[in-house]
Swiss-Prot record:
Its EC number is 1.1.1.267. The gene is dxr. Disulfide bonds: none annotated. It comes from Pseudomonas putida (strain ATCC 700007 / DSM 6899 / JCM 31910 / BCRC 17059 / LMG 24140 / F1). InterPro entries: DXP_reductoisomerase, DXP_reductoisomerase_C, DXP_reductoisomerase_N, DXPR_C, DXPR_C_sf, NAD(P)-bd_dom_sf. This is 1-deoxy-D-xylulose 5-phosphate reductoisomerase. The keyword Membrane does not apply.
Length: 400
C-alpha cells in the first residue's frame, strides 16, 4: 500500500476520546505536515469528541447512536465545523476501510473494537493495533486476514512495540530461524504488587485504577492490577510474533522503564527502554520505518539509578495463570477468557464483586465452557456471547 508523500497521511482514530486516542492526536498535532486526522470515533464522551472535531477538523466522526449523532451534529453546526457524523458499527467499519485512509489507529477497548479493526485489515490498511482483544479473540482469523490482504500490522502496546523494535526485520521467517530463544514480557506488577494477598479482598476500584507508572483508562487499569492485562498481552505476543506460549516469559519490572526484551540464542538480550508514555510506541508505529519526535522527554538514566526484576506471583495474580492456560488451550479459550474478564471487571467497577472474585468468576466460566474451534467471525462472537451469558449467570447465582 503506497501513499502520496506530497500530502499528509490521513489517519482514522478508532477510540479517539480514550487515553490512546488522545495520545495519538497529540503526536499527530506535532507533525501537521506529515499527518492529518481523517476520522475520529467516540462512544460516551460526546462533548470531548465535539471538542476534538473542532480542533482537528476530521472529515468524519462516528458515534454509537442516533441520539449521540443528533447531539454531535448540533454542536458541530454551532461551531461551524463541517465534519460529517456517522453512526454505529457500520460507521466504524466505513471509516476504518475508506479508500482515502492511509493508517488506522485501532484503540477501541474490548470486543467492540474487533469488527472495525478487522475491516481495516481487510482493506489492506496500515493498522496500528492498540486493541489487544482483536488478537485475543480471533488470533488465527485475524493474522490470516493480515497475510491475505497485505495489511501492515504494527503493535501499539508498549510491550509489543518494544519487542517489535528488538526483533530482526525478518522475524516472520520464524523465531528459531532468526535466532530468538524467548520473548521477555515486562510487567510493572501494578498497584497491588506488594499488597498482602488477604488484603486484596478489600481493595476498591479507585485503588485498582491508581497505577503507579502509567495513565490509563479504568478497564485496562483494573486489568493491570489483576495482571490479566499481562495475560492478554502474552496471548497477543504469541499471535504477533508466531510464538508458542512457553517461549513468552513474564518478568515483573516495577519501574516500567524496560518495556520488554528479546533473548537470542547467542546470549544477547536486546531491550527497549523509555519513559512510560504511550506517545513513544504511537510515534514509532506512525512513522515506521522512520522516527519522529513524540513529545516524550529523554530518559534520565541517572534519575532512575536502578532497575529491578522479579518473577510474577501467581497466587497473588491468578489471572496470569488463567491467561497462560487459555493461550495453551487455544481455539475458543482466549475469547472466553476475554469475555468473562470484561463482565467481571465491569462488575468490580460497579462494586458488585470483590477484586479476587474477578479471577474466581473467570476460572468458573472457563471450566464450564468447552474449548471449540473458531472457523469464522460468527463463531468468535458466539463464543464471546456464551461466555458473557455464563458470567452474568455467575453474578445472578452469587446474588450480585
Amino acid at each position: 500500500m503506497g501513499c502520496d508523500v506530497s500530502r499528509p497521511q490521513r489517519i482514522t482514530v478508532l477510540g479517539a476520546t480514550g487515553s490512546i486516542g488522545l495520545s495519538t492526536l497529540d503526536v499527530i498535532a506535532r507533525h501537521p505536515d506529515r499527518y492529518q486526522a481523517f476520522a475520529l470515533t467516540g462512544y460516551s464522551r460526546i462533548d470531548e469528541l465535539l471538542a476534538l472535531c473542532v480542533r482537528h477538523r476530521p472529515a468524519f466522526a462516528v458515534v454509537p447512536s442516533t441520539e449521540a449523532a443528533v447531539r454531535l451534529r448540533a454542536g458541530l453546526a454551532a461551531a461551524g465545523c463541517t465534519t460529517e457524523v456517522l453512526e454505529g458499527e457500520a460507521g466504524l467499519c466505513q471509516v476504518a476501510s475508506a479508500a482515502e485512509v492511509d493508517a488506522v489507529m485501532a484503540a477501541i477497548v474490548g470486543a467492540a473494537g474487533l469488527r472495525p479493526t478487522l475491516a481495516a485489515v481487510e482493506a489492506g490498511k496500515k493498522v496500528l493495533l492498540a486493541n489487544k482483544e482483536a488478537l485475543v479473540m480471533s488470533g488465527a482469523l485475524f493474522m490470516e486476514a493480515v497475510r491475505q490482504k497485505g495489511a501492515v500490522l504494527l503493535p501499539i502496546d508498549s510491550e509489543h512495540n518494544a519487542i517489535f523494535q528488538c526483533m530482526p526485520g525478518d522475524y516472520a521467517r520464524g523465531l528459531s530461524a532468526v535466532g530468538v530463544r524467548r520473548i521477555l514480557l515486562t510487567a510493572s506488577g501494578g498497584p497491588f504488587r506488594e499488597t498482602p494477598v488477604e488484603a486484596l479482598l478489600d481493595v476498591t476500584p479507585e485503588q485498582a485504577c491508581a497505577h503507579p507508572n502509567w495513565s490509563m483508562g479504568r478497564k485496562i487499569s483494573v486489568d493491570s492490577a489483576s495482571m490479566m492485562n499481562k495475560g492478554l498481552e502474552l496471548i497477543e505476543a504469541c499471535w504477533l510474533f508466531d510464538a508458542v506460549p512457553s517461549k513468552v516469559e513474564v518478568v515483573v519490572h516495577p519501574q516500567s522503564v524496560i518495556h520488554s526484551l528479546v533473548d537470542y540464542v547467542d546470549g544477547s538480550v536486546l531491550a527497549q527502554l523509555g519513559n512510560p508514555d504511550m506517545r513513544t510506541p504511537i510515534a514509532n508505529a506512525l512513522a515506521w520505518p522512520e522516527r519522529i519526535d513524540s513529545g516524550v522527554a529523554p530518559l534520565d538514566l541517572f534519575a532512575i539509578a536502578r532497575l529491578d526484576f522479579q518473577a510474577p506471583d501467581e497466587q497473588r495474580f491468578p489471572c496470569l495463570r488463567l491467561a497462560r492456560q487459555a493461550a495453551e488451550a487455544g481455539n475458543s479459550a482466549p475469547a472466553v477468557l476475554n469475555a468473562a474478564n470484561e463482565v467481571a471487571v465491569e462488575a468490580f467497577l460497579e462494586r458488585r464483586i470483590r477484586f479476587p472474585e474477578i479471577a474466581g468468576m473467570i476460572e468458573q466460566v472457563l471450566d464450564q465452557e468447552p474449548v471449540v474451534p473458531l472457523p469464522s467471525l460468527d463463531a468468535v462472537f458466539a463464543a464471546d456471547q456464551r461466555a458473557r451469558e455464563l458470567s452474568r449467570e455467575w453474578l445472578r447465582r452469587h446474588g450480585r
